[in-house]
Amino acid sequence: GAGCFSALNGRTHRFREYRDEELQVSAFMKCSGCGHFPGQDKGLDEKIERILEIHPDAVHLGICCCSDGESRTLCKEVEMIAAIFKRAGIPVVRGTHSVF
């Protein structure tokens, strides 16, 4: 979270495109862990629903959403969450303080 917020506040890395805009963090979430999929975890579903209700201009995924830092491949749980946001018309951006 520290690297993400630092990049956001400084409008660096993946937040550079917003350098001339006023930004507001509407939500900050982490997944519920490996093996917790949407539709199977009530707590995760509630987190997703709250973000869908807010309908932010974009959702940024941090490098911590990857299976590991080496492959830079999103884990299956996060891929499913991102797909839900995309279907709702919310752009999903890969990266905060790092681009992957």
Predicted regions and their residues:
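Conserved mixed alpha/beta catalytic, RNA-binding, or beta-rich assembly cores of soluble enzyme
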Residues: G1-E49, S71-L74, P91
